């Protein structure tokens, strides 16, 4: 059936070459057809559609008409123009999971990282070049004559709400543009007005590190396209399906990451821009929080340090950074070495013996695998943790997946049989009969929803059937935990603090997470607008009391933004002192935080 649909699309594109509509160019014709496909995809499969209508005032029909009119506004549009229109069309959803990537290589960047302080100023926190008039700690005042806030406003999506996460996304794009994400890519020189720590103000001229486009524009080759000729002896051959097990393109096989992550990750690698401020960086940007008395030599940045409380007593505290839940993307990962979840377990076992509390840094985390997330969480509790449920958009795709799972697990009645069918673990989550029963329950719920017509934002269902995360059979950290979060925590990194907070298992501090609240599905389809992939949200996660994560994010128990001093001098001393004070309270007050009437501690 899928092959038939692909053939139909190919025939449609072929006929479009030779049958111009209303005098439109070939590029415009193709873009209009691709826009129509994406509109249908949103109508059928985009779970937050109703939520976006309520939250943003977004309307699919109006948005589609606007994009169509914009495509037709150019007499002979370039492919890049059409890509920007389509990127804006999906970008209007204000959804970190939803986006389009393109087959394009044009890009430009400046080797700087900028961070905003709690008083609204912008500071350079990393300079990734040896030849620059800009220094770490300089304040950024203007970009090509525009105040920074105005420059960022030009980079927001259509329906932005001005959240910290949206502002961080614009700030990330300020010095890094990629045509593969539908950006307009600058070249040449740019003027940055900066203020030194001495107070002096200076204009600095910087040159974009520019890579030109080398994928030829369809508009330039369209006149040369010839009608295909088939020889009579040619026969069609359909590829045989390699496996009887259905390979879904949606729920079970797509990582939960923001739409831009793949392109940015590739940009980090190819540009050589190694920085602790990069999303997913192993070490992160915090300095060590005290004298290190033990440190891991593996792929996790982890150590133990002594924390002295206000009474002069010393307590050993563990620190571990979780840079990503996409464990296969971890830096320095040895594919034939110890899996990350096993190394995490060894560290947590040591922390259980040697520490009185644990600090987990998951700032700037792009998300990843939900089962890996569950696996790590299973080691941080001795009691089951309740999980958010998901309201799903169901298609035949999920129905066939459900049938496959039931077929696989049909005769599983013991722990041993569960492990034979599924393995000893699923990306770190220990497998037993309970896990198999969860998966079977999920399959039955999907089939019941389909049978009852409950397919448009279904009754809330536990993702994969997992109603709870059960404690790991061997590794269980039971002491106080403090989790550090920020507005660049996406998807699984939204769920991690949500689960710990909703179960009263950890103190969550920092700033509100990004709010990418659902599972992700990716779609590739034949096209000549250069669309590589479209990523969309396939569910709406619902927390306890009916709270959503999408667009809302996860609010910390205690908000601790970065001050100007934290950022300017990169020591984050004021932030760290507050975290240390809170952790000392957790240790001394049996995990209870005492706040004064004004909310201070």
From Swiss-Prot:
Q: Which PANTHER family match?
A: CARBOXY-TERMINAL PROCESSING PROTEASE CTPA (PTHR32060:SF30), TAIL-SPECIFIC PROTEASE (PTHR32060)
Q: Which Pfam families match?
A: PDZ_4, Peptidase_S41
CDD domains assigned: Peptidase_S41_IRBP
Q: Belongs to which family?
A: Belongs to the chlamydial CPn_1016/CT_858/TC_0248 family.
Gene Ontology CC terms: outer membrane-bounded periplasmic space
* GO MF annotation: an example: serine-type peptidase activity
Q: Where are the transmembrane segments?
A: none
Task: Give the residue range of the signal peptide.
Answer: none
Might you name a Gene Ontology BP term for this protein?
A: signal transduction
Q: What is this protein called?
A: Uncharacterized protein TC_0248
